[in-house]
C-alpha cells in the first residue's frame, strides 16, 4: 500500500496531501456513504488516488481512525462551548 498522504500542519491539523482539506472531512464524507469519486468531485483539490489510500487506511485501521474522529469531534465541541461561553449575548437573539 502506498504511504498515507497525510501531513500535519502548523496548527496540528491532519490534512490530506498538499491540500487544506482535513483528514476528518474525507473520512466523514466516506462514512456518510460517498464513494471516493464523489469526494473528489466535491473537493477538486484532492487526487482520487489519495482519497483511495485514505479510505483503504481507514478500512484497515477502523478502530484507530474512529477514535481519531471521536477526538476531533470532542475538540470541536469543546471549542464551540468555549466560544459560546465567552461571546454569548442574548441581545443578538432578539
Where do the language-model regions lie?
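Short, Lys/Arg-enriched N-terminal segment that forms or immediately precedes the first helix
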Residues: 1-16
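Long, charge-rich, low-complexity alpha-helical segments
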Residues: 21-91
Amino acid at each position: 500500500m502506498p504511504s498515507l498522504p497525510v501531513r500535519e500542519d502548523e496548527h496540528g491539523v491532519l490534512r490530506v496531501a498538499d491540500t487544506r482539506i482535513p483528514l476528518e472531512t474525507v473520512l466523514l464524507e466516506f462514512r456518510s456513504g460517498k464513494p471516493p469519486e464523489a469526494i473528489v468531485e466535491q473537493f477538486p483539490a484532492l487526487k482520487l488516488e489519495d482519497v483511495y489510500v485514505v479510505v483503504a487506511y481507514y478500512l484497515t485501521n477502523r478502530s484507530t481512525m474512529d477514535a481519531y474522529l471521536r477526538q476531533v469531534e470532542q475538540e470541536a465541541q469543546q471549542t464551540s462551548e468555549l466560544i459560546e461561553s465567552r461571546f454569548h449575548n442574548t441581545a443578538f437573539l432578539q
